[in-house]
UniProtKB/Swiss-Prot annotation:
Superkingdom of the organism of origin: Bacteria
Protein name: NADH-quinone oxidoreductase subunit K
Encoding gene per record: nuoK
Broadest EC class assigned to this enzyme: translocase
Transferase listed as a keyword: no
Organism: Chloroherpeton thalassium (strain ATCC 35110 / GB-78)
Topological relation to the membrane, as annotated: Multi-pass membrane protein
């Protein structure tokens, strides 16, 4: 039994939806960043699946660019979360109000 493109895309859609639900329902900044990374990994899975299905390496090269952007996003996001924790002593998004003077 061979795994077809539809199976990869279904798995990718499931992982992406799990990431979206994590972003929409969680209030912890670290969990939100992890959910965003989950969404990016779902996109990477789709790129690799299409690359394999079309016998083209362009999708696999795109994954490296997405991984680079994801690493930069994680580094900047984690730095922001650490800064907020040092100032507000919480990583809960509801308790952080930056617009309040």
């Amino acid at each position: 039994m061979e795994i077809e493109l539809g199976h990869y895309l279904a798995l990718s859609a499931f992982v992406f939806i799990c990431g979206v639900l994590g972003v929409l329902t969680r209030r912890n900044a670290i969990i939100i960043f992890m959910s965003i990374e989950l969404m990016l990994n779902a996109v990477n899975l789709s790129f690799v699946a299409f690359s394999h299905y079309l016998s083209d390496i362009a999708g696999q090269m795109m994954v490296f660019f997405v991984m680079t952007v994801a690493a930069a996003e994680a580094a900047v996001g984690l730095a922001i979360v650490i800064s907020l924790f040092r100032n507000k002593q919480t990583v809960n998004i509801d308790e952080i109000n930056l617009l309040k003077g």
